[in-house]
């Protein structure tokens, strides 16, 4: 989480304008920007810590979906509805690592992530399309930003009338 410990080529992370500074969780520093010492990503459990491009995330989703990374039964378990009473009465639910919205016999599934200085979303639609967006900042009103971004990405997807047939990873 310290600025001088990033990977080669890793972006700089920015907090929102006017964001308060943080008391560093690392020895030797006192007051720091939140993205660089306000929390210790190194000691977090299952949240955060990935350094990836949007293409990397899409390759990951494609590999999940293809059966090359995990078995189809494992993916089915990951996106299955949790046991009652969790998420009862909701149009979507949290499976194992994915938010899931059923759509007929399939589902849209997605994951968002956000810490000071970062925001990400990756979506896989019920019919196999996927997209990802990564930001090296997190707005002050992250919930409003998340909704606006999600709506804009769905609008873009729904506006496409002809999709390429070639492998976009090549």
Feature locations, PLM:
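A short acidic/small-residue loop/turn micro-motif
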Residues: 41, 138-140
